[in-house]
Amino acid sequence: MQIMLCAISNIASGNCSEDCKYCTQSAHVKTDIQKYRRKELSQIVLEAKMAKKNEALGFCLVTAGLGLDDEKLEYVCEAAKAVQKEVPNLLLIACNGMASVEQLKELKKAGIFSYNHNLETSKEFFPQICTTHTWESRFQTNLNAKEAGLMLCCGGIYGMGESEEDRLSFRKSLQELQPFSTPINFFIANENLKLQVPRLSADEALKIVRDTKEALPQSVVMVAGGREVVLQERQYEIFQAGAGAIVIGDYLTTKGEEPSQDIIKLKEMGFTFASECH
């Protein structure tokens, strides 16, 4: 079985104005994460080279904050061009919050293949986890990305206290968007976060993967944050459940498994890794 690997570069971290209860990058909570306004381009390129060495096809440039402004847009475009020049065979993904059609067209010109902007959860449950912006504004950014000609990467977070009805509603909204890829994150509580809920079981997490693939058969289901913690020794069962991709290495503010360990285990299990996008 061939699967797709993606890596993340957190190129602007922390001090986000938004109050998303699940996020350690919010300025509304005190956490000990690294905070920086921008990462050096040379460091981003180095991380891209490491990602490629570890069999990644996708490389995501992530910035904290509500959305793109002129300065941030210019910086992300610079980063994309720098990576493209040195590692031309990576698929570049941008994850920079709210964005207009015009801004997203600029990202596409700079070499961005796909835009990631998660709905996070259902329209009904969203006000319980964020009050500083609306679910509708997130949905609109996804429509903007499609209009700009970008591929769409849109998913969310499970295990925040949402109901099964919320999960169904959330997946129906994703069906409207028909994203190229749909990331699944499993919420991991942090003592500094306002959101304190029981962790998902491995069985429940695998059911979420199956239900997502059933709802979105044409989308690449990508399991991202929380994979190692929630699923532990069962984490590679996600592929039998319908996943076609994982995020390798460090996540935004938490440690993932060392990429090489994932590669070793997956190769032992007979998996091969996508080197181009079909």
Curated annotation (Swiss-Prot):
Its cofactor is [4Fe-4S] cluster; [2Fe-2S] cluster. Keywords: 2Fe-2S, 4Fe-4S, Biotin biosynthesis, Iron, Iron-sulfur, Metal-binding, S-adenosyl-L-methionine, Transferase. Disulfide bonds: none annotated. [4Fe-4S] cluster binds at residues 16, 20, 23. Binds 1 [4Fe-4S] cluster. The cluster is coordinated with 3 cysteines and an exchangeable S-adenosyl-L-methionine. Binds 1 [2Fe-2S] cluster. The cluster is coordinated with 3 cysteines and 1 arginine. [2Fe-2S] cluster binds at residues 60, 95, 153. Belongs to the radical SAM superfamily. Biotin synthase family. This is Biotin synthase. It comes from Campylobacter jejuni subsp. jejuni serotype O:6 (strain 81116 / NCTC 11828).
